[in-house]
Curated annotation (Swiss-Prot):
Database matches in SMART domains: EFh (SM00054)
Species of provenance: Faxonius limosus (Spinycheek crayfish)
Keyword annotations: Acetylation, Calcium, Disulfide bond, Metal-binding, Repeat
Name the UniProt record assigns to this protein: Crustacean calcium-binding protein 23
Residue list for modification N-acetylserine: 1
Pfam families xref list: EF-hand_7 (PF13499)
Job description of the protein: Possibly acts as a regulatory protein and not as a calcium buffer or transport protein.
SUPFAM superfamilies listed in its UniProt record: EF-hand
């Protein structure tokens, strides 16, 4: 469950000394959409659309995200992603390394769900398309009678509305950012894959 995911991440945050693991745990302690929020923050800091962040921007972004890292930790993070001849770090690569690993069957299920939504094949889907295809009937809270399908849909759309870099649109990377957080909370591949398939009526 999301609550267990948050708790486990908070515990890791207390014990780990690795700055990348600290940031990953901090993302997961925010729930399924933590990585999505961080991605949005980085994309907003990238005013000149260079897809890179300077050390100062990285430090500011991490601070705004609510994680207090030392200068030493920021330097370590930055230097591990810095490439020769680049003036900053590529934050898409950085976010990719923060994503909890997904197994092949899970990646394929998320990939297929996105393809199902992305009719034009341009790697971007509108929130209206998501609204028309998303099914919340197997959502744990709906199954337990704690929420209606409509409430879950609104919450799901709201999460993407507040965390995407382009208003009203969701990129493939943002879609994967969300599902990698959700995947971390589910042990069995089979359950995850069937849930994604039912969610998007695939």
């Amino acid at each position: 469950s999301e609550a267990k995911l948050k708790e486990a991440a908070k515990e890791t945050l207390k014990t780990t000394t690795d700055p990348l693991e600290k940031l990953r745990s901090h993302c997961l302690s925010q729930g399924y959409s933590g990585l999505l929020s961080l991605g949005r923050l980085f994309r907003r800091l990238d005013k000149d659309r260079s897809w890179t962040l300077s050390k100062e921007e990285l430090s500011r972004g991490v601070g705004q995200f609510g994680l207090d890292l030392s200068d030493g930790d920021i330097n370590k993070l930055f230097s591990s992603f810095e490439k020769d001849g680049q003036s900053g770090i590529n934050y898409e690569e950085f976010l990719e390394s923060l994503r909890p690993e997904m197994t092949e069957p899970r990646k394929k299920a998320v990939e297929a769900a996105f393809k199902h939504l992305d009719k034009t094949g341009d790697g971007v889907v509108g929130l209206e398309d998501i609204k028309g295809k998303y099914s919340a009937k197997t959502h744990p809270k709906v199954v337990k009678g704690e929420a209606t399908e409509d409430e879950i849909l609104k919450k799901f759309l709201n999460m993407f509305e507040t965390n995407t870099s382009v208003d009203g649109k969701v990129t493939k990377k943002e879609f994967f950012d969300y599902y990698s957080g959700l995947s971390k909370a589910i042990d069995e591949d089979e359950y995850f894959v069937s849930m994604v398939n039912i969610m998007w009526x695939x």
